[in-house]
Regions:
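Residues lining hydrophobic/aromatic ligand-binding pockets adjacent to catalytic sites
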Residues: 1-146
Length: 146
């Protein structure tokens, strides 16, 4: 399991963050790494993006592995090319982490309707960097509401 922290002191690279990371490591607890850069670096052109920019934490991205299953929560925006550009930094990190554990990657978007497009956009690059990722997960289609 993992813990996603939001208090600014846990991102200041000071004693509080060091104690947090040490404590998580000693207890074999993963630190969830939130990457909301796509949300906060884009123009808010949709109601979902406006809402996300107001609600999603804007915290520095600290790629820290505190246990054997590091967790990355990547929140993409509406612009898939921009998402791909910002995701590139994760390719090498996820591949490196895979050598010593099993990284977890959570991809989502402010408007859930864009989530399948985000997976389609990023998965080819992810698989090239980390062949063990395999094929993109199948996204079930809802045939009807009732």
């Amino acid at each position: 399991y993992g813990v996603e922290v939001r208090h600014p002191e846990f991102f200041a690279k000071g004693e509080a963050e060091q104690q947090l990371n040490r404590g998580l490591h000693e207890r074999n607890v993963n630190r969830v790494i939130l990457d909301s850069r796509p949300v906060h670096s884009a123009a808010a052109t949709s109601p979902a993006m406006i809402d996300a920019q107001q609600k999603k934490p804007k915290v520095p991205v600290h790629a820290v592995m505190t246990a054997r299953q590091p967790m990355v929560r990547f929140i993409g925006g509406d612009d898939m090319a921009h998402n791909r550009e910002l995701f590139r930094v994760w390719l090498q990190t996820l591949a490196k982490w895979h050598q010593s554990g099993t990284p977890w990657l959570f991809l989502h978007t402010p408007d859930i309707a864009f989530a399948p497009a985000l997976v389609d956009t990023l998965w080819g690059d992810l698989r090239a960097a980390l062949p063990a990722a395999g094929n993109a997960p199948s996204i079930p289609q809802q045939s009807s509401l009732f």
